[in-house]
């Protein structure tokens, strides 16, 4: 037998749960504030027991340390964010679903941390959505791991003069690795999420594809997922629109139907990335703004506060519009010039081609239009020869390749 303890505190109040386990069954429990006794329940059954918020938090913290369940072919683990999309994904997963929410690190100085998909408030909303349907829910506290795997590279990238995309790094490796590992411990046959994307078969391979709703399509953010994992993943919202999702949530009476959308880069908590970087050690050292010929054009307060293609806020007067062409971390300079100097026709990326293609459409921003290109595989990824010049491309961005709406490759510029 083993003993596990979970606690939770808020506004000076504290709750404590102590469980004695024999295998995956609770033989004794000291847990006030829950709606039913825990003794005699399996860990899976205990995860479905609701209660007062602090008590439910404390129970979740205890269960997360040891959670496991006997495999069940119909069981689906559903990644829950507390929002409407994951709540409707839970509906699609049926009566054998189990919800799981990742509690991730959020900047404690963020102006609006409640907007984040991984905040304590989001965790509570996700748990209550599951418990309202009599379904189990588990919270995984991965704040330290997330900060090392996603936040630290984001800070290092900007300090080195790159424009990193933390959401692609998170979804392409960290988040889904943790969720799939949990699904296995929970005895679930697959993992469902509320992302708007599809999985298709092509030439004997499972590949990611754009969602039916072009406005909500999230295949770009998911593009670095290893296709070998797609056999264990399900995107139940991929064939429907956001309006259909909200209508479904309202018909089911889900509280999440009224929850506001969370922003990207959740750890920023609604704040500006420049303020975040200053708070977390990226020095704002003054330097020169120069033109392509090296002539002085002005001063900046930190090169990393400028993005390739940026036009506004340069603080430089000119008879013609000037754009940021590049930044140089070593020299601490920002280079500006006319828009035509932004044009690039060849792009190289570190990454992989999931299938062999000679041509594809490439996106290097979530909202950027796709540009046709010839594709050449290289030792470390691929090189793209664009049919038309691209503007505002910068190191650190993600390049995602599509062929007829299917993701056929992804990498980092």
Where are these regions (language model features)?
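Strand-helix-loop interaction patch of compact alpha/beta domains
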Residues: 1-10, 294
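Disulfide-bonded cysteine-rich modules in secreted/extracellular proteins
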Residues: 4-8, 73-80, 284
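Active-site- and interface-proximal helix/loop "cap" or "latch" segments in soluble metabolic
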Residues: 7-70
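Electropositive phosphate-/nucleotide-binding environments in soluble metabolic enzymes
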Residues: 35, 53, 57, 120, ...
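Short, glycine/charge-rich beta-strand/loop segments that flank catalytic centers
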Residues: 49-55, 59, 168-174, 193-199, ...
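Generic structural signal for well-ordered alpha-helical scaffold segments
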Residues: 64-68, 180-184, 278
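ATP-dependent adenylation/nucleotidyltransferase module used to activate substrates
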Residues: 71-223, 243-244, 250
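AMP-forming adenylation/ATP pyrophosphatase catalytic core
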Residues: 81-84, 192-199, 204-413
